Amino acid sequence: LIAAWLGALACLTACAGGVTDTVSTAVQDSSSAIATARLALSQDAAGKLTTAATSTTLDDALKELLTSRDTLLKLSPGTEEDRAAVQEALTVLDGCAAGLTTARDAVASADSAPSLATGDRELASAADRLAELTVKEGGK
């Protein structure tokens, strides 16, 4: 009986750590994707990267972010704290996806609406939200 209880406790502890680790990994991966997108956008604005390469980079960054989001959606958090962490991360990732979409639209736009500056501001805001979430999650 004690062995069964200890086994169940170990499983619950591992599962709880798993949610935290998964959220942290998703945030880190998304931060990397946003940083890459910002670099591509700045290189495009400086005339050092083609529009096609910038578009591909932004598409890849969005795919990475959506993969992280899908990973979080598959979690089954067991505690209220874990549920709140997952929900907050999903909210931030949704905002980041919107920022990436704005940046993609800016690169693809023939009439400069939205502008590259708007896309850059959206990506900077996304990076800030991810950084805040990283600090809140313990910097993992």
Where are these regions (language model features)?
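Extracytoplasmic/periplasmic C-terminal soluble domains
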Residues: 1, 16, 136-140
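C-terminal region of N-terminal signal peptides and the immediate post-cleavage residues
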Residues: 11-27
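Alpha-helical segments in soluble extracytoplasmic regions
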Residues: 23-101, 105, 115-139
